[in-house]
Every structure is written in structure tokens, then in C-alpha cells.
């Protein structure tokens, strides 16, 4: 473009000379003609230099005056360090057309970040996700995870879990908005190089559509600010992140719900969802589908004092059984369905220097109580790996949890996850009906903060659980884990900042295994593993 401008300019400047030369050709001598040509050439060169300088100014960023400094060797330091593809601080956008009576520029400045957000909001599409992946090896062959839900995740997980969410705004006018949301989740195997979905040897490669729903705002006169949704979606999950299970979880095949409905000082989440289960017979070989429905109600974000909020929650699951399904339970050895519930409360305290702690109290009965008694994954499911079975007799279980992180000075941070549980007369998936249990699990993760991007620390985990069956026989399960790690981060928070890359060395030992009989490779009761793992969400 610049060369073309130069050539055009030269032609325009030489054109008058050509006309004048033709008109004077008959009266000028050769010397006079040469003199005129030299003069015109000098003028052309001057004009070309002017255009060249103007072009340079267009592409040279403005700089501020500064003194020239020297480095330790006495050389002048470059006051204008080079950078590639530097982003402008702002962009100009055209405002709405002004009336004749209005004054001022029709353009205004907008930061590049705001402009990017404007474009994203205008398109109405977002892509969010999460995944983890990594490499590890162990002292006795292939590394194995054990009791992640009690001993902690660092250096103890070898899966490639992912969540991918697509959201598209389809309407946004007159105070009403409609969005379509689809979420996929699953696992990509970390053992073999091929990871075809459906080639599920070892249970590693699988995927599902966990969410597919429409969410709206502004359609309910009594709750215009709330999110009203219909489709395959459940109530929001609340996770004990260091243990990789949920204190609040309501899975759904389909449902209808309302979130963030402002009522009084807090907000209400309410969901009515369907979650059918496979009801098994006592041989665990035959099954029948039972339609169940769940009501999940939460009153959240209730202010208590400075930076403290309270949530109160309740959940009830009931079955809508056909006559043939009831007959199978009465006469053909299928387990009876028993309605199940969970109630509780949680308190979240944020700290002035960053960090938080969340305390929760939960009580449940029947099949949800059975899942309170699991030492590995302890989310409040109504089934065990999707199967409903067991003689549930109305027994109850209680769970107290603490999780959070706190900064100690400028260079230390510690995260925690502590759970105490007990239950009476529950169905245990390890020790059967009319079981009692008591368990405690504790994981702490202190680290030294080198800077915003580096931390070095240790994750220490210990748990012990005792079950007592209907005959008062006792079964114990316990173990501990020590993980040394260094992480590359983008912020100092352990629980709320990602991406994160970890390098770790882990020693894990099973002290007692009377509930599951677990062993590592070569029938060992311990394992030393090293590896690296990446975890990211966006």
C-alpha cells in the first residue's frame, strides 16, 4: 500500500511538469530544460519524504519523554523495549447519531476488555468447561487411586474427567431473556493411547449429556429477576473440592425449577425433578425401572454478620410406582422402595484477607443415609452406582463438614476438608442392613507462596471408619496419605483459582481394609507414586 501511494504521488507531481515542458519545449534550451527537471525531481523527493514520514507516524505508538539510563556495563538501556503485536489500550466506537442541536464527538473511547465483553454479549454465546489430565507412575506397576473421598485428591487421582458447557442466548428483548444450555461430561482414559467412547475397557472412556435445558428471566411476574428453567437439569451442586464429592447434589433426568428468587433477606432455589432408578432383586441380576421424583428446596445467601451467610436446605425423594412394580416387590424378591429425605444447613464465612470457610450440618434417612456411610465417594445419592437395592428400615445418618482456605501472613496458605459422620440402623453397602457406622476424615494442605505463580506444599490426609453389622461384628477401614507438591498457578488461592499444573510425589498406605479388601498392585498395602497433573476451568 505504501509503495502504491508513493508511485501515485510521483505521477501526480510529475504531471504538471509534463504539461509545462511540452508548452515550453520550443522556447527552452537543453540546459534550461535539465535545470527544470532537476528542480522538479528535488520537489518530488521532498514530497515523497513527507508522505513517508506521515505513514511512519500512523504505525509508531506514541511514547513519553524519559531520561536515558545505563546498565551495569555502562551501555545505554533501550528506553523503548520492543514488543510483538502490542494490544491498544482502547478502541474508538461510533455512538448513536446525534441530533443537529447536540454537540460533541460522535465517537467515544472504550477499553479493549470492555469492547471484547460487548462483542461477546452481543453474540450471546459462551463456552465454559473443566477438565483434568496427567501422567503418573508408581512403585508397584500401574498407579491406583484409593479412598479419594477420605484422603484427598492431590497425587491420588488418575482420571481424565471433563465438563463442557455450551450456552446460547436466543432472545433478549423487553426485559425478557431466553438461553439454551447444553452440558456434556464424562471421562477420557489416561492409561491407553486410544480413548474411543464406547470402547470402555476398564470403565475409562464415556460421555453423557448431563444438562439440556432452557433457562429464562422476566417471564414470572412474581420473580422477574430469577432464573426459571425447564429441561434436563438439576439443582446446583455444592462440592467438598479436596475430597471430590458433593454435600448437595440432586441428579435429574428432567425437571423444572427456579433459582435466585429474591425472597426476604435471601434467595430461594427450588427444583422438581425426575430421576428414575433401577430397582434390583436380591440376586442383583434382575431389575425393574421405578419412576421417582425429587423436590429440592434451598433458602440461601441469608446474611448473618459481616461476610457471613447461611443456607437452609431440604430434599425429599418419592416413588410413583405401578401396580406391577409393587407386585414384584411383594412377591418376586425385588427390594422395596423407601422414600428418602435430607435436611440441613450450612454457614459460609469469608475472610478479610481472602479465603473462606464453609461449615455444614446434614441429616438423612434410608438410601441417602446409606451414602453418608461410604468412605470413598459420599455424595447424597439415592442409589449405589445407579442401582437401588438394600433393606432400608428408616435408619438415619448425620454429617458435619468443614472446608475452606485461609492466608497466614503474606506467604502461607492452608486449605482444609474435615468430615465427621455417624449413622444408626442404616443399610450399608459393605455390612448390610441394620448397620451402625462412625467415621472421621481430615485433609489439610499447607503451602508456601513464592509468588502469584508458584507454590510448594504438602497435602496430608487421614481417615478411619468403623462399621458394626446386625450381629455387632466390627469392621474397620483406615489409611493415610502424604503428598509433596509444587504447583504452577495464575493466582494464590488453592480452591478458587485455575488453571493449575502440579508436580507431586505421594506415599499412600492402607492401614486397615476390612470393608473393601483393597490392595495396590502385587497385593501391597502401600504405594509410592510420582507424576504431574493439569487442572483447568474457564
From Swiss-Prot:
It comes from the Bacteria. Its main location: membrane. It is found in: Cell outer membrane. One of its GO terms (cellular component) is cell outer membrane. Residues 62-73 have a biased composition (Polar residues). Pfam families: LamB, Sugarporin_N. It is a multi-pass membrane protein. Residues 52-82 are annotated as: Disordered. Homomonomer; no physical evidence of a homotrimer has been found, however conductance experiments suggest it may be a homotrimer. The monomer probably consists of 18 antiparallel beta-strands. Part of a cryptic operon that is poorly expressed in vivo. May be an ancestral sugar porin with a broad carbohydrate specificity; it binds aromatic beta-D-glucosides such as arbutin and salicin, but with low affinity compared to the binding of maltooligosaccharides to the LamB porin. This is Cryptic outer membrane porin BglH. The lineage of its organism: Bacteria, Pseudomonadati, Pseudomonadota, Gammaproteobacteria, Enterobacterales. The gene is bglH.
